[in-house]
């Protein structure tokens, strides 16, 4: 009886593994490098909600101040490993596309793990040239319901939402988003 039970368990396990091996490539292809999700209805337009963050001089800055160009908002923190892993890609693409796209690199400044002075030092030490904005009052992160970082919000030049992506992105995926946004291509 034990041998029969063991044989059934082994057969079920083998069947599950075979099914997983067959389905895995299909289920993950939409997340491969260079791809962007195609899960929104292009007939539905959702306007991006406005918020206020602070620049390096502690001047209040509104999202709506930047409508007119495509906008990429990245919510991040210096203690977040996945955030730190994607910052070099953001910096490279900021240098390449800064005339065509607005980059709002928004630090979730909690006053403890991340302070304005510690983030200025972090950015300087890493040689990043992108502008950093500080979400001191959590207006931006609350507005967009940020509960997990990194989170990146893509906004069309007219102020309508293009996409929201949670999790770190590699440079190829991020650049694909940028090219689609500045090329006027709809998802």
How should these model regions be labeled?
Residues 67, 75-92:
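Conserved redox-active cysteine motifs that mediate thiol-disulfide chemistry
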Residues 120-157:
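Short, internal strand/loop/helix patches
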Residues 69, 87-107, 124, 171, ...:
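Conserved helix-turn-beta segment immediately C-terminal to the redox Cys motif
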Residues 154-187:
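Thiol-/selenol-based redox modules, centered on thioredoxin-like
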Residues 101-114, 129-137:
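Thiol-based oxidoreductase modules, predominantly thioredoxin-like and allied folds used
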Residues 1-48, 187:
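N-terminal targeting signals for export/organelle localization
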Residues 72-73, 103, 152:
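Hydrophobic beta-strand anchors of alpha/beta hydrolase catalytic cores
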Residues 50-71, 95:
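A short beta-strand-turn-helix
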